[in-house]
Amino acid sequence: MTAATVPAGTPAAPPAPAGRPGRDRYLDLLRTVALLRVVIYHIFGWAWLTIVFPSMGVMFALAGSLMARSLGRPALGVIRGRIRRLLPPMWVFALVVVPMMFALSWQPVKEEGAWWFIKLAWYVFPVGAPPFPWSSGDQAGLLEDTWAVQAAGPLWYIRAYLWFVLASPLLLRAFRKLPWATLLAPLGLTAVIGTGLVTIPGETGNALSDFAVFGSCWILGFAHHDGLFKDVPRYLTVSVASIVMGFGLWWASGHLTADGWDLNDIPLAQAAWSLGFCVILLQYAPSWQELPGRLARFDRLVTLANNRAVTIYLWHNLLILATIPLLDLLWKIPYVDAHLGSAVEAGYTLLMTLLIWPLIALMIVAVGWVEDVAAKRRPRLWPDGRR
């Protein structure tokens, strides 16, 4: 398995059944594709997927658009509602993962003193990065010793999302006064702190870098909601977006890491490529009250993914790891061990891909209803829009 700790997926506004007025199924479809891409990326680790579909930028842009729409109401109530929907699913995740970490010999770091215990509170309110052990258990155990790193990997997004939610009233006010400057400011900030020009150490630096890298995408969501690009000729928008994307690829070509063209490791390239990509997606965005044509067959899947986006996002990395001991049971079947062992080994990641979806489905049934409770809705086990 090729492991990666950069997540993807996004907390979304409380989804509604298909066809409800005001629900844009095009945006719902984009969110579903983004979640699918994130899961596949974390199984195979294909760097090129970050170029083909920059899921994180897309998710932040969609969330920014929804946030701008919500801020037509009093800001304090909107922020409270967003936090209320976000935190309970994370608390359930933490109630499972944190005891597992301690059970596998996780110990406080003496050098950090009381600060180590204070950081545990970030599993409750993740304004900072929740701590986790870099090695937990042993390599010969049921889960590989990096399982905690993989399980906690998606939590950076929760932190970034929370920062954006808290900052949105000020960001939206700035955007409506100086739209273009506000839209491009995070890209400029990334050029400073995401390239080594200025280094901010520790988790503070990581948090600021994430905020800068995806800030333009979040604010682009404001632009989409407010119709900033409606009066701009489409050819001009696409041309400028393509130049920005080209710059991102050019920058990446000179700053490749051990993972090659994985834009998750190249902040400025990620910021530029994601912004340009999202501009084009939203510039050509239709407004669908229902999925058209052949896409209609995926309506239930899209509805389910949007209703359980937080659950899928939080748990998918841990569930990917869970496929490994389950698949290893195949070697306990004598016929498989004797005749199919090499075939199973050659197709291991494909088998992981097939197995992850039933596991995600089980997790949706087991804990997904917490998203409904958090949104003050009636709990549902399988909210795919079927009546």
Which residues fall in each region the model found?
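Alpha-helical transmembrane segments and their immediate juxtamembrane cytosolic regions
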Residues: T2-R387
